[in-house]
């Protein structure tokens, strides 16, 4: 073994890259260690030959967190890691997004990246280490790759400014959580959530990260120079310009006309006809190109046609200019039995969004490397195939659905009330019923509307917009509210969500180099204009949260008892609290400080549970009259129950003003009587009287 080790300073952290000791049969393998806190093994394997049956680049990224890394044994019956968690899926996407555009066009060999967290102190997120390791492993592998890339996480505090690669503790106090990745001269990916920061503050964070991760890129270059394998002898296929020119001459004008059809289904039908005609004319005969080659070139003609039209100032596919948002149609309260609902339609994109309120027990239990925790807010995004007029697989959420759901969640989360103000668990589900671009941002708008319809006290309404970019040479056009085709054919997908005051989420994916600060400023400015436009239309339908929760939502009552009384409410083995829940049909959560939250499907159920708890925790008050039940009769008096678990003694002399020979002459067991509390001694024994009740009532007790 001859391991090569490269150590460098990255902000306040010391990063070590090591190769040549572990996973030597992989095409590229790097062990990344950050401050002895996090260690990630990253491997890259590339197939030497492309699969001719695949018409796409088969890149897969797998990020996995091993529980042994944090000194834990997995839960469950099998005691081993299972399917990827949501965190692992999101991090896999985070790594995939900046590296995918850096593989050369036409490269179709399968590439698999596996990032394994093997050690962590649970102080920082291992995702940045995994991204650095991916860059290094690709750089030394010899696989055609236009990297390396750098990556960094940025936090922000109003008083201290930007902070590079913060710990979990520092992130908790930050108003920004942003991950940025890119090359030495370009930003390729941004993923962030914020607490209403300005556009300038968000752009500043992107530029700060880009400057800081240059140290990563330089270190990876030095590692590759010392330990890199020879670059693969791969060349892209020679473009068939003769065939391209022939098809464009025959069909170019018709394709351009096809892209003036504003209805998506009609446009696709017309372009499909033209594609079939091109295949029939230019393939099929001996010596002619294959049908797949003709289709590929036809797709290239579509790509160039749309882009040239846009940068030359012609109307977009649906006739809009570059800054216009598609027509909106907004409804709330569309589903009568749900807690909150909204139907948000923007052009041919539509989301049916539903908000549901639950108890603290409904919170999502997360088993992470940092330990178990509960998440009281969930946002789930569903993208069924019918939303784009297709048949397709139905089943669990895929990577795309998980990623879009997380972006929508990030967008609205900062505007949710604090748990001590609104202690409900909240689940929002966005059902995409139509899709033609930016369904995730439709989910943001719909989620904000549904939450306000449910009566969740949002700090402010939230809206989102997707921006696009087409850049040809020195010409460029920034597009507001992109269609699906514009997303596919453009150079940038730039999604911004926020309130009227500031940005709450920013996601950016760039497919080309050369996105300047000027272009990002223009995109953020146009996004702000569009966001304010959408918020204005949303506010006309529902401008603030409803003052009362939906009648269908559970009723919540908060109360507090003395900590000494917690044991009484819970009872032996939980018997008392179980009995209350079963009899009242309410759910009860008790904290160690005596705070109690009661959730009932109806107000009556919650009130009944509250009264039961008050009865258990109440103390007998001297001088107060109670209606009690005779529990036991003895020679010297009777024991009467006046509160749950609290009996007092009525001495025989306190039964009546007249002389009483036998207690049973006055009382019988099970009888209800009014009693006056005379005294409670230091041992908690209660002295009662029946004969003094009348006098006490007369005196106004």
UniProtKB/Swiss-Prot annotation:
**Domain spans labelled S1 motif:** 623-691
Q: Which InterPro entries match?
A: ExoRNase_PH_dom1, ExoRNase_PH_dom2, ExoRNase_PH_dom2_sf, KH_dom, KH_dom_type_1, KH_dom_type_1_sf, NA-bd_OB-fold, PNPase
Q: Which reaction does it catalyse?
A: RNA(n+1) + phosphate = RNA(n) + a ribonucleoside 5'-diphosphate
Cross-referenced Pfam families: KH_1, PNPase, RNase_PH, RNase_PH_C, S1
Q: Which cofactor does it need?
A: Mg(2+)
Q: Which UniProt keywords apply?
A: Cytoplasm, Magnesium, Metal-binding, Nucleotidyltransferase, RNA-binding, Transferase
Q: Name one GO biological process term.
A: RNA processing
Enzyme Commission code: 2.7.7.8
SMART domains membership: KH (SM00322), S1 (SM00316)
**Is the keyword Nucleotide-binding assigned to this protein?**
no
Q: Which GO terms describe its molecular function?
A: 3'-5'-RNA exonuclease activity; magnesium ion binding; polyribonucleotide nucleotidyltransferase activity; RNA binding
Q: Provide the transmembrane region boundaries.
A: none
Occurrences of domain KH (ranges): 554-613
Quick one: which residues bind Mg(2+)?
Answer: 487, 493
Q: State the oligomer form and interacting partners.
A: Component of the RNA degradosome, which is a multiprotein complex involved in RNA processing and mRNA degradation.
Q: What does this protein do?
A: Involved in mRNA degradation. Catalyzes the phosphorolysis of single-stranded polyribonucleotides processively in the 3'- to 5'-direction.
Give the family per the record.
Answer: Belongs to the polyribonucleotide nucleotidyltransferase family.
Q: What is this protein called?
A: Polyribonucleotide nucleotidyltransferase
